[in-house]
């Protein structure tokens, strides 16, 4: 059985995330390895409620700040050439990549 690399991408900008996914797919097509994905995983929504008034006096009015974390999952055959090219991808600062090798 051939090894495969499971690539898990996460970030706050879906446009940047899809751009990195397109780069990974282009590398897989160039090197001729099999690819599965990108599979969109559920978006995590982080909500922080804060008081509007700085002193705490007055009516209790609240603001809600929210950050969404988008995730994608890509499986690719663990070819040495493909993995070396994956390491050279220019990744935006708001995107994190996790690569796990599996049997």
Curated annotation (Swiss-Prot):
BP terms from Gene Ontology: translation
A single GO molecular function term of this UniProt record: structural constituent of ribosome
This protein's UniProt keywords: Ribonucleoprotein, Ribosomal protein
Lineage: superkingdom: Archaea
Entry-linked InterPro entries: Ribosomal_uS10, Ribosomal_uS10_CS, Ribosomal_uS10_dom, Ribosomal_uS10_dom_sf, Ribosomal_uS10_euk/arc
Cellular component GO terms held in the UniProt record: small ribosomal subunit
Subunit note: Part of the 30S ribosomal subunit.
Function: Involved in the binding of tRNA to the ribosomes.
Official protein name in the record: Small ribosomal subunit protein uS10
Record organism: Methanococcoides burtonii (strain DSM 6242 / NBRC 107633 / OCM 468 / ACE-M)
